[in-house]
Amino acid sequence: MAFATIDVTKGITGVTPVANGGTALSSGFVNGSTALNEADQWRVTADFTPAGYVTANWERVDTNFAKIGTGMSESSGVFTFPSTGIWRIDWDTNGKYNGSSREIATRIAITTDDASYGYVTEAGSFLSRTDSNTTYYSVHAQGIVDITNVSTHKVKFFHNTEDTVTADGATGENKIYATFLRLGDT
């Protein structure tokens, strides 16, 4: 096999392309970073019957995970942000039921005055069982919020179902959990 040499500078003005791992940056500088500087995950550790805000049994994920940055703080299911900025929040719920038909709702709620909460997003599902086996569910909600004051902007999570539903908590894996990613500055 023959290899040819190509002169890439002929007919090119301005910046010369660079191959084989070069940066092609002939002048200027790179400022800042696009890497995440805050990432955190929390999960619910015990099974429960969903009936409103999830206020108990939260722990920071400790299985094959290490937070980036300061991380969120939690008290009775209310999460406080470590810094201002644009944040992505994911809320995942999983569970099982033994009834005939069940509606499932999960919501992310935020306050900007440390008092009244409103929903950022809602996700839901309606499950209908056709046999006598246990049926499992998974619902995901996601929102992007602008946190401008860490003293007053907080978030909590809502999960509600009809009866005979069990939300599956766990300590060794994520079944009911929240993910927090700081995407950038306000």
Pin down the residues of each PLM region:
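Short, intrinsically disordered N-terminal pre-domain segments
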Residues: M1-T13, D185-T186
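Extracellular jelly-roll beta-sandwich "head" domains, especially the C-terminal globular C1q domain
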Residues: G32-T186
